[in-house]
């Protein structure tokens, strides 16, 4: 029987609350799906909690555990008490973790966990119904990692966006793999600014080469990022499939997409350091897209669904347990369809109520 080693970072404020519900889901799988194996959970501090105890947002011990693990589950980090004026900040720990694990691809799905949530979207139901795409953002290159010149009082500053062909090739391969894994295979949308930027022209050429040569059965379409941003509001279904883009553009477009399903508390994410083809280790960092929410933490009202669905992504991509991943997603849908909703969705369920409802549905599915 397989043992899956998972490092758990509860993080700060609401982070430990939502992670607790996600762990309930893993325990339910362990009990009701023996073939899935055992989950060896190792708890460590990250972010502000680690700063408070160790004056370090990510200790060597925690980092080494994460490197050795099969996957990392994270709640949320940060808070006003560790502000931007501090020399040691929670975000430094997460950036170091991503760098050391080599997680070059960030995945953010944009879909509705339940059809009943369509009316929660800021977009009209007839516009957003059926939206189902995943943004694959290049995470370790581009303008965030380029040379920069700070304003020294002269009134001039500069940021540069470097990209190499190798960096683009590996993210294009990840997008191609994810698109091909869909049934039927999904369309690939590549977003750039090739009419202006040299890096975008290299991006477009490289993505075209990779998809046409390595994934010839896939349909690829290029879209300028500004046009895609408009399309995302006007007709988000048009982008259904796999959306691949650079670090900066992905940061912006994935945040724009996150409002479509109605609550950021619903949305998961994965940051992967390889291709999840089951042929080798594919470590990843799995976390909800929301922040640590210090204003509502400790009140039992935070929505844990984004973290629970992050567990589903972990099961699918790092632990090679697709049946259990599907079961978790189906359980979330059933729980919401049956009326269990947290405050952000217009309900009155507590954080633990939501987690318990998902677990109850999951047990039914796994026992069927």
Swiss-Prot record:
Species in which this protein is naturally found: Neurospora crassa (strain ATCC 24698 / 74-OR23-1A / CBS 708.71 / DSM 1257 / FGSC 987)
GO cellular component terms, semicolon-separated: cytosol
Free-text remark on how the cofactor is bound: Binds 1 Mg(2+) or Mn(2+) ion per subunit.
Catalytic activity: (2R,3S)-3-isopropylmalate + NAD(+) = 4-methyl-2-oxopentanoate + CO2 + NADH
Domain of life, per lineage: Eukaryota
First-tier enzyme category under EC: oxidoreductase
Name the record gives this protein: 3-isopropylmalate dehydrogenase
Cofactor requirement: Mg(2+); Mn(2+)
Lineage: Eukaryota, Fungi, Dikarya, Ascomycota, Pezizomycotina
PANTHER family noted in UniProt: 3-ISOPROPYLMALATE DEHYDROGENASE
Entries under PROSITE patterns matching the protein: IDH_IMDH (PS00470)
An annotated GO BP: L-leucine biosynthetic process
């Amino acid at each position: 029987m397989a043992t899956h080693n998972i490092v758990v970072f509860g993080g700060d404020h609401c982070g430990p609350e939502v992670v607790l519900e996600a762990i309930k889901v893993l325990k339910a799988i362990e009990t009701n799906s023996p073939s899935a194996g055992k989950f060896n959970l190792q708890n460590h501090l990250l972010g502000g909690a680690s700063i408070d105890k160790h004056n370090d947002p990510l200790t060597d011990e925690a980092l080494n555990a994460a490197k050795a693990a099969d996957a990392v589950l994270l709640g949320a980090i940060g808070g006003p008490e560790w502000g931007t004026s501090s020399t040691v900040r929670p975000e430094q720990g997460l950036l170091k973790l991503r760098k050391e694990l080599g997680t070059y691809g960030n995945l953010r799905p944009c879909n509705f966990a339940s059809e009943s949530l369509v009316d929660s979207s800021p977009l009209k139901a007839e516009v957003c119904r059926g939206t189902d795409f995943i943004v694959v953002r290049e995470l370790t290159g581009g303008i965030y990692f380029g040379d920069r010149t700070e304003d020294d009082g002269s009134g001039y500053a500069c940021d540069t966006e470097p990209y190499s062909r190798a960096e683009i090739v590996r993210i294009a391969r990840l997008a191609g793999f994810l698109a091909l894994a869909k049934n039927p295979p999904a369309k690939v949308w590549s977003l750039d600014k090739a009419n202006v930027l040299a890096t975008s022209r290299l991006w477009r050429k490289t993505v075209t080469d990779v998809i046409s040569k390595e994934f010839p059965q896939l349909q690829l379409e290029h879209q300028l990022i500004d046009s895609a941003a408009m399309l995302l509001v006007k007709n988000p279904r048009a982008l259904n499939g796999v959306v691949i883009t650079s670090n900066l553009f992905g940061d912006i477009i994935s945040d724009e997409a996150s409002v479509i399903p109605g609550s950021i508390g619903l949305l998961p994410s994965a940051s992967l350091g390889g291709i999840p083809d089951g042929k080798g280790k594919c470590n990843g960092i799995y976390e909800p897209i929301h922040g640590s929410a210090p204003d509502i933490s400790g009140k039992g009202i935070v929505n844990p669904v984004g973290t629970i669905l992050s567990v589903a992504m972990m099961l699918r991509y790092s632990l090679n347990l697709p049946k259990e991943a599907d079961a978790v997603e189906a359980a979330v849908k059933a729980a919401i369809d049956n009326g269990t909703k947290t405050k952000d969705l217009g309900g009155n369920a507590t954080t633990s109520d939501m987690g318990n409802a998902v677990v109850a549905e999951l047990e039914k599915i796994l026992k069927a």
